[in-house]
């Protein structure tokens, strides 16, 4: 079996993501992703409920929902950064630092797999260039095809 150009490119991406996560460690890598994700989710879900409170503090404004969203996002993000700094102090101890690197490696593999799935999903869905020949030759596409094809079907239903 030959390795296609797409497999080579995706393999390099996977390697970079995995090595980066291993070097940074699980705590830093996980909290760098979780802080943005949690802050965005909490801000999206809660900013409308907090608008009356910020209206009392800031008065009436057209930009009040945007300001409330930003305040909520930054507040949750700062809390997550504080938790990250606390966890980092525990993760840098001699006994746990090795586990931090090992878990970072596995987290990098998971993160890289998700990234490759998203890239393949976008390659399947995009209408600009025909990449079906490249995708057909790809071993990585064959391995991840159950996830990718379900995503393609879902996206085509929503479009």
UniProtKB/Swiss-Prot annotation:
Write out the annotated subcellular location. Cell membrane
Segments traversing the membrane? 5-27, 34-51, 61-83, 103-125
Topology relative to the membrane = Multi-pass membrane protein
Question: What Pfam families does this protein's entry cite?
Answer: Colicin_V
Q: Where would one find the signal peptide in this protein?
A: none
Indicate the principal place this protein occupies in or around the cell.
membrane
Q: Does the keyword Ubl conjugation apply?
A: no
Q: Which UniProt keywords apply?
A: Cell membrane, Membrane, Transmembrane, Transmembrane helix
A Gene Ontology annotation in the biological process aspect, one of them, is: toxin biosynthetic process
Q: Which GO cellular component terms, listed alphabetically, does the Swiss-Prot or TrEMBL entry include?
A: plasma membrane
Q: What is this protein called?
A: Uncharacterized protein TP_0522
